[in-house]
Amino acid sequence: MHTNVLNLSKKLINISSISPRDLGCQEILIKRLQLLGFFIERINLKDTKNFWAYRGKGKTVTFLGHTDVVPAGSTRKWKTSPFVATIKDGKLFGRGSADMKGSIAAMLIAVENFIKKFPNHKGRISFLITSDEETSGKNGIRKVVSILKEKKEVIDFCLVGEPTSEKILGDCVKNGRRGSLSADLMIYGTQGHIAYPKLFLNPIHNSIPFLLDLSNLIFDKGNLFFEPTSIQISKIFSEKNCTLNMIPGELRVFFNIRFNTLVNKKKIIRIVENLLNKYLIKYSIFWTYHAKPFLSSSNFLLNLLTKCIYKHTNIIPKIKNNGGTSDARFIFNLTDKIIEFGLPNLTIHKVNEYVYINDLLKLQNIYYSFLEKLLL
């Protein structure tokens, strides 16, 4: 029963498609989709492979995924070769097994089985696949969505196969994502000899009260779908050409804010810059807006997927819109009916990444039931 989804997962894992390289993963998928009668549009942009595939007419159900993976890291720490799919103790090991080649295999096999049983199904099934999700994303779904909008393509429902499950398959789904805003802050002082602190302004000492308040900022209390907005300082360093007997003239601070739908970019920037001004800090700051938060408007889609998950796992999933960003934020420009669900994320981006083989079959069956409920 596992053979098809397991074999396809293994084929994809055996390709070292480190982002943004695809190296043939998508052609494996495309050939199988063509046999099912899908129209294929390759949308390759610079070093990134993308494709849009569809079959049928009417309301469109889109499966969204990525064939790229993060690097393996230190191969010496792996128990198996990261790009040789290996079965051991009921698990499938390999880079991308959980994030997200296993999910892509489950999607495709579910669609194959569905079309074989219901060749005259109503509606349209589509796939949107990229090889640039794990790194910049600049030539991936972001640009493809713009192209599809120009062509007046319509997506009614979108299922993203990101690894949303936590401890066990089916325990978590996502119907939204937090926004992300980063800051590169330069705090200025005056450089001088460390033995004469009264003559100079030490930007490190001067910034400590501000940094303490910054790290404790409360933007909101969160809501039913989102945790409170959070801020994390990621890097602090003084100017490079400063020896141990010098007061530095500059201090550079990097921080990131993950925010929900209760606040926006302008409000966050205003709060942070008001805090800087409160402490009379001389500064310059450069903001990078990575992603806007979103929340799916479709309780229908959430309830439908919940029933499918329960049918095959006996678990009612929790809604947890935490974690990083995903390509779902770009699809939100085409549809606000989005749900994310996939394999457990316990080992993603780690050495010895793996999935349980039984989970691959269960996920395939959940995706199949999802299609049944939407298109029959």
Curated annotation (Swiss-Prot):
Q: Which cofactor does it need?
A: Zn(2+); Co(2+)
Q: EC number(s)?
A: 3.5.1.18
The metabolic or biological pathway listed in the UniProt record of this protein is: Amino-acid biosynthesis; L-lysine biosynthesis via DAP pathway; LL-2,6-diaminopimelate from (S)-tetrahydrodipicolinate (succinylase route): step 3/3
Per UniProt, the cofactor note for this protein states:
Binds 2 Zn(2+) or Co(2+) ions per subunit.
What SUPFAM superfamilies does the annotation carry? Answer: Bacterial exopeptidase dimerisation domain, Zn-dependent exopeptidases
Give the top-level enzyme category: hydrolase
Q: Which reaction does it catalyse?
A: N-succinyl-(2S,6S)-2,6-diaminopimelate + H2O = (2S,6S)-2,6-diaminopimelate + succinate
Any one Gene Ontology MF annotation carried by this entry is:
acetylornithine deacetylase activity
Q: Which GO terms describe its biological process?
A: diaminopimelate biosynthetic process; L-arginine biosynthetic process; lysine biosynthetic process via diaminopimelate
Q: Which InterPro entries match?
A: ArgE/DapE_CS, Bact_exopeptidase_dim_dom, DapE_proteobac, Peptidase_M20, Peptidase_M20_dimer, Peptidase_M20A
| Family (UniProt) | Belongs to the peptidase M20A family. DapE subfamily.
Q: What is this protein called?
A: Succinyl-diaminopimelate desuccinylase
**Upper lineage:** Bacteria, Pseudomonadati, Pseudomonadota, Gammaproteobacteria, Enterobacterales
Which gene is this protein's source? dapE
